[in-house]
Amino acid sequence: MDKINIRNFAIIAHIDHGKSTLADRLIEECNGLEKREMKDQVLDSMDIERERGITIKAQTVRLMYTAKDGKVYYLNLMDTPGHVDFSYEVSRSLAACEGSLLVVDSTQGVEAQTLANVYKAIDSNHEIIPVLNKIDLASSDPDKVKSQIEEIIGIDASESLLVSAKSGIGIKDVLEAIVSRLPAPSGNFDNPLKAILVDTWYDTYLGIVILLRVVDGVIKKGMKIVMMSSNAVYQVDNIGIFTPHKKIVDQLSVGEIGFITASIKELSDCKIGDTITEEQRRCDNPMPGFRTIHPVVFCSIFPNEAGDFERLREALKKLQLNDASFTFDIEVSNALGYGFRCGFLGMLHLEVIQERLEREFNLDLTATAPGVVYQIISKNGILREVHNPHDFGDVQDIASIKEPWICATIMVPDQYLGVVMSLCNNKRGEKVDLSYSGNTALLKYRLPLSEVVFDFYDRIKSISKGYASLDWEMDGYMDSEIAKLTILINSEPVDALACIVHKSKVEQRGREICLRLKDLIPRQQYKIAIQAAVGSKIIARETISPYRKDVTAKLYGGDVTRRMKLLEKQKKGKKRLRAIGNVNVPHNAFIQALKIID
């Protein structure tokens, strides 16, 4: 295939601005699917994506388009996620393309994730075509949005395309702009094979599948290839593309995006961003690869059935193959047994992984409180990174504790600016900058990550009636007053409920968890004491009263000492029961107790 007729492009936008709907219309216009096969969000293959109306995994599809100049062009479309938790998926997709369609909702304008994604595209040297979507709505204001694009982002918006992805207006113009304004891929057909590994996933029938972009040379069926980071050698079994159906082809050459299978058994050989080359004729230098991504939110996941531990381990391995940003290690809990300490890019990422484990692998799970990575410096100068409360150590040995901070970009209509700033201040935030574009405020704040990951996104959306948008990036570590909060039930610490909290909020958090547990733990035959402690100091307590059997019911008058004797006997029995019995704590109590409302 002549690379002159190839166009590789990504669709980038803020969440809910219509990326997946635009992808549907492009597929429909290019006859990628028959009318009877078309459905909304056709590239969103997971049920969870359809139900939530979001894209989680970047998807690729090759389309054939006959342009006005009479030539047939091959368009490789990458539909990318819009939520901040999946920004790593966006970065990978952009590395495989030369251009981007920047989709902006013409009723909403530029939002925070629009900025983040377009800057990623600029860093990738992309040609960018602004596309203003939803122009058929009465509240659409294309001129205002063009001004915003030029003022806030700093790119020319004079030739922005006006479309309605839902009704199909302007789709032909988008396709013509792709072939006329976006560059063809560079690279040399005669050079040794050089391909970048963009994504991997597990297929029940094919095993490990690799999505790649050929930069130089050609890859053919039967060729022996090398993973340059590990020097692992494999023979290519199958080569294919998505149209969006899987279609087997003989080869992929310069500029093409497709998938291969090669009977790969070792997950460690498939590193996202690795360079693939031919064993007999290796390329000189590997590609730069992708920026290593590190999880920022951690929580423990336990199977509710002890026998499901191995099933959970296998499920996590398969999900990790499909999502390199997700990590896990074995953990043992006194309360919940064997499980895994898992790392995520944010709370939505955590929810999606847990939901996929439960749906796709039919597992019943309990997740503990999410937390972030703290740096603990001991008195002898040793630095430890801790994300698990169990590893906090003795307070007497700690010289200082640092917590991660972020730089948040918040875009909000000016009428909601006051409540948003108030929320940021309540979350221990520090204002960095405030600017305006029309009646939209662009707010920059530094905030502790621990205050952001749990419910900050939902709270911002709620107080701004859905109009505010948020993006953030890591901004280093700062000294902080941090304490480990321990929850005790009948004087026994419950490790699954331990959490690391800022000292200014430790009493409030302790009281709230105790109150929640009081509502969630059923009454027993003996009194249950629920306590929150920092070190040896009890900071909150709630008591669950026992059931009381009326042991004196059979008495009718007579000596009062008989009554006292029966009550004393009941008291001794309950004391013995309390000493030998375990408190029955329902599994859902753990996660419910930690869903604290500010």
From Swiss-Prot:
MF annotations from Gene Ontology: GTP binding; GTPase activity; guanosine tetraphosphate binding; ribosome binding; translation elongation factor activity
For this UniProt record, the keywords arranged alphabetically read as follows: Cell inner membrane, Cell membrane, GTP-binding, Hydrolase, Membrane, Nucleotide-binding, Protein biosynthesis
The segment(s) forming the tr-type G domain are 4-186
| Pfam families for this protein | EFG_C, EFG_III, GTP_EFTU, GTP_EFTU_D2, LepA_C
Q: Name one GO biological process term.
A: positive regulation of translation
What's the catalysed reaction? Answer: GTP + H2O = GDP + phosphate + H(+)
Which Gene3D superfamilies does the record cross-reference, listed alphabetically? 3.30.70.240, Elongation factor 4, C-terminal domain (3.30.70.2570), Elongation Factor G (Translational Gtpase), domain 3 (3.30.70.870), P-loop containing nucleotide triphosphate hydrolases (3.40.50.300), Translation factors (2.40.30.10)
> Mind telling me which GO cellular component terms the entry cites?
plasma membrane
Q: Does the keyword Cell inner membrane apply?
A: yes
Task: Give the enzyme's main class according to its UniProt record, as a single word.
Answer: hydrolase
Residues binding GTP: 16-21, 133-136
InterPro entries (UniProt xref): EF-4 (IPR006297), EFG_II (IPR041095), EFG_III/V (IPR035647), EFG_V-like (IPR000640), EFTu-like_2 (IPR004161), G_TR_CS (IPR031157), LepA_C_sf (IPR038363), LepA_CTD (IPR013842)
* Locations listed in the record: Cell inner membrane
Describe its membrane topology: Peripheral membrane protein
EC code(s) of this entry: 3.6.5.n1
Query: What HAMAP family does this protein map onto?
Result: LepA
Tell me, what does this protein do in biology? Required for accurate and efficient protein synthesis under certain stress conditions. May act as a fidelity factor of the translation reaction, by catalyzing a one-codon backward translocation of tRNAs on improperly translocated ribosomes. Back-translocation proceeds from a post-translocation (POST) complex to a pre-translocation (PRE) complex, thus giving elongation factor G a second chance to translocate the tRNAs correctly. Binds to ribosomes in a GTP-dependent manner.
Q: Which family is annotated? A: Belongs to the TRAFAC class translation factor GTPase superfamily. Classic translation factor GTPase family. LepA subfamily.
Q: What is this protein called?
A: Elongation factor 4
Q: What is the lineage of its organism?
A: Bacteria, Pseudomonadati, Pseudomonadota, Alphaproteobacteria, Rickettsiales
